[in-house]
């Protein structure tokens, strides 16, 4: 049986080249605003890495920093960016500080600039089958699966995780691909019973080594969207070493879903730019 470790960086680079080419054809740089509140160091690193990725394809990006006490200023800036014709995409760097009104963020962000699809409006459109945007990580996961060439129709897909930004959307997207979908979560009894039935297994629970090799069947396609830091190293939710020789396709962490998610931020920013051009 064919076995392959999926190279997310290679897939990401192809997407970036496509985005860069389209931007050059437009002859105008899209602009992305990233709003971040609080002093979480990892969030700062993620935000700055997004800026670098944007610059590599010709997108202008700026990070707006706010202290955890500047909630009013945060929302004032968000509303101004909503109306700014020169700002095409807006991202909110999560998590926001405790006490921030996250529901207000979901209600306030301009849906046509909401490149990570966090607004209530965009989530509704996604589940109605008429999305303006698809959340970046679920979009990356589906792109990776399509890139394998595996026919998803009729496959049993198991998703571990039910967050609004990852688990639920990716389950919906897999349904759209005509998979039979099972969603597992922290209250699921006998997780291994479900994972052993999966033709496609998407792990997005945020718990290191949640899935081991003895919990999957031979030939499974495993997409690991987990990010866990342990003793200074990054790990996924699946025990890669015990799974890599059993899976037909598997994403490593790091180097799997992460780079493709970053590329999808760029792609969605380009889509937001196109919406703005159409409205002129």
UniProtKB/Swiss-Prot annotation:
Keywords: Amino-acid biosynthesis, Histidine biosynthesis, Hydrolase, Methionine biosynthesis, Multifunctional enzyme, NADP, One-carbon metabolism, Oxidoreductase, Purine biosynthesis. The keyword Cell division does not apply. CDD domains: NAD_bind_m-THF_DH_Cyclohyd. Pfam families: THF_DHG_CYH, THF_DHG_CYH_C. It catalyses: (6R)-5,10-methylene-5,6,7,8-tetrahydrofolate + NADP(+) = (6R)-5,10-methenyltetrahydrofolate + NADPH; (6R)-5,10-methenyltetrahydrofolate + H2O = (6R)-10-formyltetrahydrofolate + H(+). Signal peptide: none annotated. One of its GO terms (cellular component) is cytosol. Pathway: One-carbon metabolism; tetrahydrofolate interconversion. It comes from the Bacteria. Its EC number is 1.5.1.5, 3.5.4.9. One of its GO terms (biological process) is L-histidine biosynthetic process. NADP(+) binds at residues 161-163, 186, 227. InterPro entries: Aminoacid_DH-like_N_sf (IPR046346), NAD(P)-bd_dom_sf (IPR036291), THF_DH/CycHdrlase (IPR000672), THF_DH/CycHdrlase_cat_dom (IPR020630), THF_DH/CycHdrlase_NAD-bd_dom (IPR020631). Belongs to the tetrahydrofolate dehydrogenase/cyclohydrolase family. Homodimer. Catalyzes the oxidation of 5,10-methylenetetrahydrofolate to 5,10-methenyltetrahydrofolate and then the hydrolysis of 5,10-methenyltetrahydrofolate to 10-formyltetrahydrofolate. This is Bifunctional protein FolD. The gene is folD.
